[in-house]
Amino acid sequence: LVHVRAWGDYVVLGSTIDDAVGEAFDKVAKALGLGYPGGPVISKLAAQGNPKAIHFPRAMMHSGDYSFSLSGLKTAVITYIEGENRAGRAINLPDLAASFEQAVIDVQVAKAKTAVEETGVSDFCVGGGVAANPALRAAYKETFGCMGVRVTVPPMSVCGDNAAMIAVGALRSYRTQGFSPLTLDANPNAQLGLWSSDATPVVPSGM
């Protein structure tokens, strides 16, 4: 979760402490034998299910910061699957997918809403592969629409292509002549905070 104060001026508010959202979707899909990548198939199933059918944990919903954790939710879903299989009960895939997806969305939207209120921004942008999730896109638009905050999401055609999203940032730097020196070394594990003006996590008040 990043506060973009200007192009190249980023404040990292918080991030996942374990699994990323897309990774959690992939692992749940794998546990169900639905293949890879898991996001599209889980999303498609969820659209046909009841998000209240199964209660899964909303990890770190009230943690008092902007950190996320998906590992516990993933484990809870896998434990449920294993329990149903041992009992010989058929799993309602749409209901399970919808319940899992809703647990993810509730936390993502709640923390984003608090961040918007704390920073006072008037625009919210959804990025990353998870931006392709229709339910998450709709939840952000509904929540922030009521607050008068403009929501921007990438076209679905590029949401699953990380290279395209990175290229957009590079194009902006190119057009503004924001070139790095030739002494810059490649670092596949570089963090956004290393290139921003402030990498210190921000603790929200009143969460």
Task: For each feature predicted by the language model, list its residue ranges.
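A cross-family phosphate/adenosyl-ligand binding-site feature
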Residues: 36, 176-192
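Buried hydrophobic packing segments
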Residues: 28, 112, 166-170
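A contiguous, well-structured pocket-lining segment that forms one wall/lid of small-molecule binding clefts
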Residues: 44-124, 134-147, 174-177, 194-207
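A short glycine/serine-rich beta->alpha loop
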Residues: 11-16, 62-66, 150-159
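Glycine-rich phosphate-binding loop plus the immediately following alpha-helix
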Residues: 2-50, 74-84
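Short glycine-rich phosphate-binding loop at a beta-alpha junction
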Residues: 119-130, 152-155
